[in-house]
Design a protein with these regions (language model features):
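Extracytoplasmic
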Residues: 16-54, 58, 71-75, 160-161
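Hydrophobic core of transmembrane alpha-helices in multi-pass small-molecule transporters
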Residues: 29, 109-125
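Helix-breaking motifs and short loop linkers at transmembrane-helix boundaries and internal kinks
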Residues: 51, 83, 104-107, 138-139
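Short hydrophobic/small-residue motifs within alpha-helical transmembrane segments
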Residues: 64-69, 154-155
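Primarily marks hydrophobic transmembrane alpha-helices of the MFS/SLC 12-helix fold
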Residues: 85-88
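C-terminal ends and interior cores of transmembrane alpha-helices
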Residues: 93-106
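Intracellular juxtamembrane helix-capping segments at the cytosolic ends
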Residues: 125-138, 145
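Glycine-rich segments within core transmembrane alpha-helices of 12-TM secondary carriers
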Residues: 141-161
Length: 161
């Protein structure tokens, strides 16, 4: 009896493999929802709640994005020391907590700080930790798996916009 090889399969990853794929897809979903599209969608409502303009909130988002990249670099160093699995969980939790701070910020300073932390941590969860998880879990099918996981970007845009 010939066993069928999954060498050429693009779906035979097993339950644990699909769990990882969906987990990483959701990290990208939240990244787009919190940062890329989400920050533009909430700017008007946040500005109204703070008594400022949407343009000011967009400026805060730009500053937060630059600060988020700095956080991203710091998390990269920590990621190498304690591992991608632990860091992805830590980053997702921090991003969720600080996003609540974004939505409830009393002024633009608090908003910018919370958005910077949210940006840096959710970006780190998806790109730094997620990339390492894919490389470790799917050493021979990284490209196919990254194709599935990055669908989170497009699905989030379709849902949020």
């Amino acid at each position: 009896m010939n066993k069928k090889s999954n060498k050429d399969s693009v779906v035979a990853f097993g339950g644990a493999g699909w769990f990882h794929i969906i987990y990483m897809l959701l990290m990208f979903w939240f990244y787009v929802g919190m940062i890329n599209d989400g920050s533009n969608n909430i700017a008007g409502n946040i500005a109204e709640a703070m008594g400022t303009t949407a343009g000011n909130i967009s400026n805060c988002n730009a500053i937060a994005g630059v600060l988020g990249v700095i956080i991203f670099l710091i998390v990269g160093v920590v990621n190498r020391k304690i591992g991608a699995r632990m860091m992805s969980g830590i980053n997702c939790i921090i991003a969720g907590i600080t996003y609540m701070g974004v939505l409830n910020a009393p002024n633009t300073v608090v908003y910018t700080i919370m958005m910077a932390i949210t940006c840096g941590t959710i970006m780190s969860a998806g790109y730094l930790c997620g990339g390492v998880l894919v490389a470790n879990w799917f050493p021979k099918k990284k490209g196919i798996v990254m194709g599935y996981t990055t669908m989170g970007h497009n699905l989030a845009t379709a849902a949020f916009v």
